[in-house]
Amino acid sequence: GFPCGESCVFIPCISAAIGCSCKNKVCYRN
């Protein structure tokens, strides 16, 4: 539920490496 400060409109979340995932075009973690 915390935003990772990254969007995922055109590319995947680079922050997925630290547990972030794409939701509503923004990367979130928990």
Swiss-Prot record:
There is a cross-link at G1-N30 (Cyclopeptide (Gly-Asn)). Keywords: Disulfide bond, Knottin, Plant defense. GO terms for biological process: defense response. This is a cyclic peptide. InterPro entries: Cyclotide, Cyclotide_bracelet_CS, Cyclotide_sf. Transmembrane segments: none annotated. It comes from the Eukaryota. Disulfide bonds join C4-C20, C8-C22, C13-C27. Probably participates in a plant defense mechanism. Has anti-HIV activity. Belongs to the cyclotide family. Bracelet subfamily. The presence of a 'disulfide through disulfide knot' structurally defines this protein as a knottin. This is Cycloviolin-D.
